[in-house]
Regions:
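Ampiphathic alpha-helical segments that act as solvent-exposed interaction surfaces
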Residues: 70-104
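Extended Gly/Ser/Thr-rich low-complexity repeat segments
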Residues: 34-41, 66-68, 84-91
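A structural detector for beta-sheet-dominated domains
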Residues: 25-27, 58, 74
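Short Lys/Arg-enriched alpha/beta "domain-start" segment
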Residues: 1-49
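Intrinsically disordered, low-complexity regions enriched in Ser/Pro/Gly/Gln/His and often acidic
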Residues: 50-51, 90
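Short proline/glycine- and acidic-rich turn/helix-capping motifs at secondary-structure junctions
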Residues: 54-58, 96-110
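Long, contiguous binding/interaction regions
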Residues: 2-9, 51-55, 61-62, 68, ...
Length: 110
């Protein structure tokens, strides 16, 4: 398991203080950089930037950003939904990492 614990922050996006939607960030305390090419290989429509150690992805109506030091999700309706979404994303990272021997990593920027 790559991510065992994380710190969570749920907030109103500063660029949209009038919105009723929230953003959330999980900071796992481990470097996710090596997992990004594997996520890039399996997530349809992901946009990977190896130099920035970032992978952007749209999941339903949520914008998701995987960085070396954090996972961020936007456009969630409330705190509970933000926590659930981040837990699902962390599980995705962990499952992908555990299966990395079966996945051909993609370093392609799209």
């Amino acid at each position: 398991m790559l991510i065992e614990t994380y710190d969570l922050e749920v907030f109103t996006p500063p660029c949209h203080p009038e919105t009723d939607r929230l953003s959330a960030i999980a900071r796992p305390g481990v470097d996710l950089r090596e997992a990004l090419p594997y996520l890039n290989a399996i997530l349809p429509g992901a946009v990977y930037n190896a130099a920035a150690a970032a992978l952007l992805w749209k999941k339903d109506s949520h914008n998701v950003a995987f960085h070396a030091d954090r996972i961020a999700v936007g456009n969630v309706p409330d705190r509970e939904a933000a926590i659930e979404e981040l837990e699902n994303l962390i599980e995705l990272v962990n499952r992908t990492w555990e299966r990395r021997a079966e996945i051909e990593p993609s370093h392609e920027s799209r």
